[in-house]
């Protein structure tokens, strides 16, 4: 694994496919895994430095780790789980536990065991236990991966509310672009153990720069290009020649992408700069229709997603003759 990043933001997302090294990055920060080389520094405190032989033990790092399954002790009640790591006197411990139970909306659940709690209640208990340590950093390891879409959205909202007054750094890893976009100020994209793109979350989504980053941020249509000059590229897979009037195509551009919602239907006169619509398949969803348009033989289908109001126009006028690429929506990708 070779991951390097520096950030001054307080809400950081790490986005990557399964098995790319996201969780290993968190475990290295927490001290669960020991890297072979490199440095880990948080708020000026060196947690690990291979060259100087520094390796702080996990319990000395002031790092809270929220595991995917929350890792609550099954034979302990909510209040016992929260207070397990507290080292002060009994009176201070009871006061601290009561404050955390109230803050994380666990009132009335103090005597229950984890098996009697809902997923959201288990998550809040695990977060309260982390907060009892007063960590400088909280690490969230795919906290919603086992939940269905509705519960993920609801629990993400709850998590953001619970952490709204936490002044430390929170790092969340996920393969869900929606979770990362909603949660993060800054995002690191990881591919095969390498950090390939770091930046403000909106900037990375608008200009992912690399094919992998484009795919992970939701771009369905990506193809290699032949750069003809500083304004023109030819896309063999789509049989499209695009000329950019307001943008310059650098020599580093090896591919382009266009998001499935950004295409414009064209009826009548078409040009070489448009994707010809000949054969297609479609799938209906509650709020949109997805078209999969056949391109050149051996190439992946081209994706065009339309909202319900556009679907109504298509019902009336039929499929367009072509799809146009808005210049400002085309993603320039370096490979």
Task: Identify the function of each model-found stretch.
Residues 206-229, 257:
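C-terminal boundary and immediately downstream tail of ABC-type ATPase nucleotide-binding domains
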Residues 77-212:
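ABC ATPase nucleotide-binding domains
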Residues 38-50:
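Conserved ABC transporter NBD signature motif
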Residues 2-11, 15-17, 23-24, 31, ...:
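Non-catalytic connector elements of ABC transporters
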Residues 32, 62-63, 67-75, 176:
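Catalytic "switch" loops of ABC-type ATPases
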């Amino acid at each position: 694994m070779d991951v390097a990043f520096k950030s001054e933001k307080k809400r950081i997302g790490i986005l990557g496919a399964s098995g790319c090294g996201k969780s290993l990055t968190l475990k290295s920060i927490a001290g669960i895994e020991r890297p072979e080389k490199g440095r880990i520094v948080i708020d000026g405190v060196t947690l690990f430095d291979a060259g100087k032989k520094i390796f702080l033990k996990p319990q000395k790092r002031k790092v809270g780790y929220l595991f995917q399954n929350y890792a609550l002790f099954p034979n302990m009640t909510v209040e016992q789980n929260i207070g397990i790591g507290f080292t002060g006197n009994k009176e201070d411990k009871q006061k601290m536990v009561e404050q955390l139970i109230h803050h994380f909306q666990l009132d009335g659940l103090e005597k229950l065991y984890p098996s009697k709690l809902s997923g959201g209640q288990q998550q809040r208990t695990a977060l309260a236990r982390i907060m009892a340590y007063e960590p400088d950093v909280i690490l969230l390891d795919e906290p919603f991966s086992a939940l269905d879409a509705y519960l993920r959205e609801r629990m993400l909202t709850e998590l953001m509310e619970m952490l709204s007054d936490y002044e430390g750094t929170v790092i969340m890893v996920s393969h869900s672009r929606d979770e990362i976009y909603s949660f993060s100020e800054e995002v690191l994209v990881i591919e095969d153990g390498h950090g390939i793109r770091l930046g403000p979350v909106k900037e990375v989504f608008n200009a992912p720069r690399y094919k992998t980053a484009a795919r992970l941020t939701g771009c369905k249509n990506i193809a290699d290009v032949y750069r003809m000059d500083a304004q023109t590229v030819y896309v063999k897979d789509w049989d499209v020649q695009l000329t950019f009037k307001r943008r310059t195509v650098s020599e580093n551009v090896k591919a382009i992408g266009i998001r499935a919602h950004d295409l414009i239907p064209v009826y009548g006169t078409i040009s070489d700069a448009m994707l010809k619509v000949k054969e297609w398949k479609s799938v209906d969803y509650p709020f949109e229709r997805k078209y999969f348009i056949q391109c050149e033989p051996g190439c992946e289908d081209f994706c065009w997603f339309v909202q319900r109001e556009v679907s109504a126009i298509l019902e009336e006028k039929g499929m367009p003759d072509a799809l146009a690429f808005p210049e400002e929506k085309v993603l320039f990708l370096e490979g």
